[in-house]
Amino acid sequence: MSTSTVIRPVARSLLQLRKAGNTPPAFLLPCLQSSSTTSSCTQSTSFSTSSTHLYPRDMNRLRGVSTQRRTGPRQPLSVSNAKLPQPVLDESKRLKVKVDENHGLYEFFRHKDKALSTPAEEGSHGRPWSAEELRGKSWEDLHSLWWICCKERNRIATESYERQRLEAGYGDEDAEKRDMTVRRTQRAIKQVLTERYYSWQEAEVIAKDDPEIDFSGEGPLYTPRDFEEEFEEDVLAEAEGEAEPKPAQVTA
């Protein structure tokens, strides 16, 4: 039976070629036989021993929820039966809220009557403070100047955001120059404070060997010796003056 199953496809192919008038030579019979047998034994499905990496179910909890198709949420939501407030369209019935003209939030804007500055106003600014000028300032002056710079940078950022939102198309270059000027002033303030900190550290090392300075915390921190000696001499002189006997008064 096995021989007949192999010969039948070969004979069928030979008969078809003979009907067509083309008889193949004898040495091509093994080729015809192998092609016919392999075609009948071809594997139709793929085979793999590796495990699949696909999950048996979808882990997306929002699968099927779409705002464009208005499918709604997959779980019920709690909605109250309260009525929504209606807007007051009549301006005469609206409440007039009084706003403080000197409110602190106005400090974030350069102008109260307009949102953006003109290019001329944005470009009109002075030069930054130098470290030489700031070395003679007090701690309070440096602290105030630092927060003025912070407020100015906040104003610049607010106007830059507003220009980007409105697509004004101007003022970006002037705002960058103005911001760089403020940043240079802040850099000079940091330099002066760093110099003062290093000077304080060096003075603390020198003060440890100074007899007039006491770091123990039990008494005053600074006690000048010359003033103490002069004070002791004055006290002794006053005590000696009080101890001298007074001359006797002669009465008639």
Curated annotation (Swiss-Prot):
Keyword RNA-binding: no
Family: Belongs to the universal ribosomal protein uL29 family.
Biological process, per Gene Ontology: mitochondrial translation
PANTHER family (alphabetical): LARGE RIBOSOMAL SUBUNIT PROTEIN UL29M, RIBOSOMAL PROTEIN L47, MITOCHONDRIAL-RELATED
UniProt-recorded name of the protein: Large ribosomal subunit protein uL29m
Subcellular location per the Swiss-Prot or TrEMBL entry: Mitochondrion
Region (Disordered): 233-252
UniProt subunit comment: Component of the mitochondrial large ribosomal subunit. Mature mitochondrial ribosomes consist of a small (37S) and a large (54S) subunit. The 37S subunit contains at least 33 different proteins and 1 molecule of RNA (15S). The 54S subunit contains at least 45 different proteins and 1 molecule of RNA (21S).
Residue range covered by the transit peptide: 1-39
InterPro entries reported in the protein's UniProt record: MRP-L47_sf, Ribosomal_uL29_mit
Pfam families (alphabetical): MRP-L47 (PF06984)
